[in-house]
């Protein structure tokens, strides 16, 4: 399940976005799919690669992948007087199938997830190449909100309590990697234990 009004918090009004806007940043939301726009929230970002008409009234917001690399290249090259903040949503590697009827079994789901991981790595490399080429001093944060549930047959099994250490890590692990400008890595970088409050640390 998702938090009530989660899309509105992410897309319309949240502390991180407001900090950037209040400090003169131009903000961009680029996504491979309009999942976070499904309820047509008020757009808090200055620029988005989707319009309201791109998002249907009925659907999941998932399915067809949209190009994010072309607009990213365009907007990072754009010469403006403001600093820029980009929120880029990439959906791979995702997680195992949601329901038992869709499941390929533990081994099949693991193999499929590994394929999507390879696709994600390719997209990430292309994304980082564009950013570093057009903005060499960019601070880049790569973060996942949860694990891929690899080791399970299907996602709904996460609602069954388990003490299996590997499954717990597969469900709840969040991945975080930071590219610091000019390789200037602060000493607390290695002490990150969680992605929670990561922006509070970054902007302080």
Segments predicted by a language model, with ranges:
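Catalytic domains that recognize anionic headgroups
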Residues: 1-204
């Amino acid at each position: 399940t998702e938090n009530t009004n989660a899309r509105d918090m992410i897309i319309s009004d949240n502390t991180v976005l407001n900090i950037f806007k209040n400090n003169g940043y131009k903000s961009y939301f680029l996504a491979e799919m309009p999942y976070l726009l499904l309820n047509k929230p008020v757009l808090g970002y200055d620029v988005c690669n989707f319009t309201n008409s791109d998002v249907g009234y009925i659907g999941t917001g998932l399915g067809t992948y949209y190009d994010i690399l072309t607009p990213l290249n365009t907007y990072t090259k754009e010469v403006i007087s403001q600093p820029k903040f980009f929120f880029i949503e990439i959906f791979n590697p995702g997680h195992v199938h949601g329901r038992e009827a869709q499941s390929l079994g533990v081994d099949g789901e693991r193999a499929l997830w590994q394929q999507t991981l390879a696709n994600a790595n390719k997209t990430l490399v292309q994304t980082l190449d564009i950013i570093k080429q057009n903005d060499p001093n960019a601070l880049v944060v790569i973060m996942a909100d949860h694990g891929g549930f690899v080791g399970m047959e299907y996602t709904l099994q996460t609602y069954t309590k388990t003490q299996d250490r590997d499954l717990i890590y597969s469900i709840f692990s969040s991945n975080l990697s930071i590219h610091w400008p000019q390789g200037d890595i602060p000493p607390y970088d290695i002490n990150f234990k969680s992605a929670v409050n990561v922006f509070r640390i970054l902007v302080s």
